[in-house]
A protein has these predicted regions:
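Alpha-helical interface subdomain recognition
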Residues: 5-153
């Protein structure tokens, strides 16, 4: 496996990790929204909270499905370089959305540093940019995908 093959594995691994972080954000936000009461009702009963949770799920589920598809392709000898570059961007944007919305749902509790409960979201929120840059920045991934897709003069 050459250098480009290593990049493929790295980007797949990063996408899988970002998907896991995104899911943690969803899980923590749901748990908090069910427990937290506002105006005498659980926070999760608010339409806007449900919409945020659905949007978070949409982002992570599409990212997870794409990751599984590309993992299968790579395991079967394909080298979908453009798709892997786009997946890395998609997974980092999904993670960013999930971390941001989880922080919004958690409110002040989201800023607490801890290794369990809502405090996990604070760490993930800080990790978003590292994951977006590591393995090739979003801008580099866009350029790589564009070249692979033949978008040049």
């Amino acid at each position: 496996m050459g250098v480009m093959g290593n990049f493929s594995q790295e980007r797949l691994g990063m996408a899988a990790g970002m998907n896991a972080y995104s899911q943690i954000c969803i899980d923590e936000a749901v748990a908090w929204a069910k427990e937290r009461k506002t105006f005498g009702k659980p926070l999760i009963d608010n339409q806007v909270i449900k919409h945020k949770l659905v949007d978070m799920n949409r982002a992570v589920r599409t990212s997870r499905a794409w990751t599984e598809l590309l993992s299968w392709k790579v395991m079967n000898g394909e080298s979908p370089i453009a798709d892997l570059a786009m997946l890395k961007v998609h997974a980092s944007k999904a993670m960013e959305l999930c971390a941001r919305e989880a922080m919004q749902i958690l409110g002040g509790a989201g800023y607490l540093r801890a290794n369990s409960g809502p405090g996990k979201v604070e760490r993930i929120y800080r990790e978003v940019r590292v994951n977006a840059i590591g393995g090739g920045s979003e801008e580099i991934m866009y350029d790589l995908a564009a070249r692979q897709l033949g978008y040049k003069s």
